[in-house]
Amino acid sequence: MDIRQAKDQIKNAMLAYFSKDEFGNYRLPTERQRPVFLLGAPGIGKTAIMEQIAQDLDVGFVSYSMTHHTRQSALGLPFIAKKTYDGVEYDVSEYTMSEIIAAVYDAMEATGKREGILFLDEINCVSETLTPAMLQFLQYKIFGRHRVPDGWIVVTAGNPPEYNRTAHDFDIATWDRLKRIDVEPDFAAWRDFAVETGVHPAVLTYLDIERDHFYRVETTVDGKSFVTARGWDDLSAMMKLYEEQDIPVDELLIGQYVQNGEIAKRFSVYYDLFTKYRADYQIERILEGSAEQSVVERAREAAFDERVSLMGLITDALGGRLRDAVMEERAVEFAHGRLAAMRDALTVDDANALPLLREEAASLQARLDTERKAGLLSDEKYVAYQRALALIDRALRCDAAGGGVPFSQVKALFGEMVDALDARIAAVSSALDNAFRFVEDAFRNGQEMLLLVTDLSVNRYGMAFINDHGCERYFAHNEDLLFYERGADLADRINRLDLTEDEA
């Protein structure tokens, strides 16, 4: 299965494992909660989806790579303890707490979360001396004498032996204790993730054209030659930073991430062409609705590669605006909730809110720091916390004369925040409408329109914005996309029917 399907499977398993009966006990006993084992090539996003699942479920997350662990670090260090049996004192062997189990307790203490995911990567690379202990751990969640705390679910991962020399296959006894999920590199699944997270449009459009360059591992006379999803994702982030600093993105940089000489060279050539398209088409003017007719005509006459690049530029620019608008809207909703709680805590209308503001600022900052340290701070939460803290900071500055801060003044500052959001939403709605107008003028209802509608549909920020604020052109063209998909499905069924009749 692809990484998107794997995420759904794991998330469903986590929900089942976390379910409790009427008495608060987990419905599936610990020894029957099979650890999930993700088996797949390196760099396809196994660790990333586990972090996302932990954030989605709002549970703790601890990640460990097993490659560097010895028997002592995994099980704990032995020491001599005194025990009395039948009135006779004996020296017995005990173990200190496992480094891994201790990390789980540390995470619980830091975040206050009693439930979480313990993710152990490269588990099929452990040393042979650790294998018997791992077998016990996989079934009973015990390292040495210490058990994984109740409420913490074990997920493991590893690479097949053909990708990792130190990896070894498990025997049937081990496989029979695991919930195995085989993950394959899949561009279509990664593309949805890339659109949502804002992967550089040059990377996205290049891979739209050269899909077989998405993931490749080869053995050459010079050693391994490879390119992975992780490589493209990391290259994308670096390209954005280079562009912000006006540092050239060249083949030397690309080759540090895309470790296949041929693909690195071809992408370097494509990127140079892409930057030319970006300068020529002036995407900002398209979204402002002020693109010149010559730009529309050039797009209409453009070759396939240029059209793909242009649509990538448009959807990337739209995606950034949609993401920012949705995150700001959720930040305003979060701030409204905090202010409502503050208002309810005041005993007198328009009372001095200064003590509550200070208390709220300290609480939010502590919450932000804790979730960041635990790796549970999503971008949406970060923006919400920072916007609320900025609002509180502005309110606290109103106490410059030492007379306190009436709640009405806090409400006025929040009103300015809402006005700024309304202006942003109006601007994004206009940009969305102008993008559809441009694509209609240049390409009518061609494949480019289907690409625009599809990219908006798989982008959760795009769909959140459109569902909340509407977009008539999106809904009209989405109907066309549904008819197209139904027609394609019908044609596929007819082809299968014809094939069956021929075979008969």
Residue ranges and their predicted role:
Residues 5, 9, 33, 52-55, ...:
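Residue-identity detector for glutamine
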Residues 196-355:
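Alpha-helical lid/collar subdomain of P-loop NTPases
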Residues 1-212, 217-220:
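AAA+ P-loop NTPase catalytic core and its hallmark functional loops
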Residues 8, 12, 16, 55, ...:
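Charged/polar, solvent-exposed surface patches and flexible loops
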Residues 300-504:
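Terminal-proximal interaction/regulatory segments of ATP-powered molecular machines
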Residues 3, 20, 98, 127, ...:
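Short, structured coil/loop segments at alpha-helix boundaries
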